[in-house]
Amino acid sequence: MDKLRVLYDEFVTISKDNLERETGLSASDVDMDFDLNIFMTLVPVLEKKVCAITPTIEDDKIVTMMKYCSYQSFLFWFLKSGAVVKSDNKLDDVEKEKFVATFRDMLLNVQTLISLNSMYTRLRQDTEDIVSDSKKIMEIVSHLRASTTENAAYQVLQQNNSFIISTLNKILSDENYLLKIIAVFDSKLISEKETLNEYKQLYTISSESLVYGIRCVSNLDISSVQLSNNKYVLFVKKMLPKIILFQNNDINAQQFANVISKIYTLIYRQLTSNVDVGCLLTDTIESAKTKISVEKIKQTGINNVQSLIKFISDNKKEYKTIISEEYLSKEDRIITILQDIVNEHDIKYDNKLLNMRDLIVTFRERYSYKF
């Protein structure tokens, strides 16, 4: 929104100077909210009349769009003269180029605002369903925790098989589902569009990214780890072929389930028997204790998921800094431990031993801004 405000100010400044000079009339007071509503109405019309608005749209298309935008619609020039935005194309070459770029960026940012408004409306509509799903999920988790045998836990999963499949299909077909779950617990997403935009950039996951990630995991070679065909794995193998994302993208559900089972087994072993992993976790916890105020957390009165998420949201900058510092101070140690595990178990991708340093550094450089 800040960027849009800057672009709007530039647009108005250039437009007012040119209009007042050409007509001898004085511009009225500026009302950004009013004018943005006009732009939000115009953008779909311009896309229908001219072409789709994209970052690569040509200058001549932008100039054509200017022809369909009358200054009379905007409050600062409301009903004063019949000038259109294209009239500013008479500026000298440098100013003209700047104005065209400003107008293009304005349209792109308004397009984003339209998308946010649409998501904002859907978030309000979908939260009731999300609340219902969340309660059911917590109920299933509670029953699983209360199960004393593997058979009892398997029965809980079987009894809720249809719900689990339908919920997974909803989650995997909606790139904003994670965002909607957060909105249930953090009301700022519903009341503040700035927060919604920030969270959208962080927590939106496209189907393409999911499919790519699933394929990468499926293609891992962890043949040294024995497959555990317990009832949980059998349940996952029966369930995954019914997931639409797997069906539509021809993903081998059995292969993915096998790899996930092996990864789970490997992680469990490392957490329970790897001395280096244990020392790393202990050092991290002890270090975090010196930076996190336990008293502050107690005073907040966190007693459920909603209050926990609200607390994290209210203090995310502080905890983001702590997590970042902790990770960066231990990155080399983490990479060494992970590479040792990879070497010991001969974990390969595309017939090559995984290089954990390359993998982690690449991930950090590409995606760390999201966290």
Swiss-Prot record:
Q: Does the record carry Methyltransferase as a key word?
A: no
Query: Could you name the Gene Ontology cellular component terms for this entry?
Result: host cell cytoplasm; virion component
Cell compartment(s), UniProt: Host cytoplasm; Virion
Domain of life (superkingdom): Viruses
List keywords of the entry alphabetically.
Answer: Host cytoplasm, Virion
Keyword set includes 4Fe-4S: no
Provide the disulphide bond pattern: none
Quote the function comment for this protein.
Lipid-bound viral membrane assembly protein that plays an essential role in immature virion (IV) to mature virion (MV) transition. Functions in both crescent-shaped viral membranes formation and its enclosure to form immature virions. In addition, participates in targeting mature virion proteins to sites of virion assembly to ensure their correct localization.
Q: Which family does it belong to?
A: Belongs to the orthopoxvirus OPG132 family.
Q: What is known of its domains?
A: The N-terminal domain is not required for crescent formation but is required for virion formation.
Q: What is this protein called?
A: Virion morphogenesis protein OPG132
- Per the UniProt record, the source organism is Vaccinia virus (strain Western Reserve) (VACV)
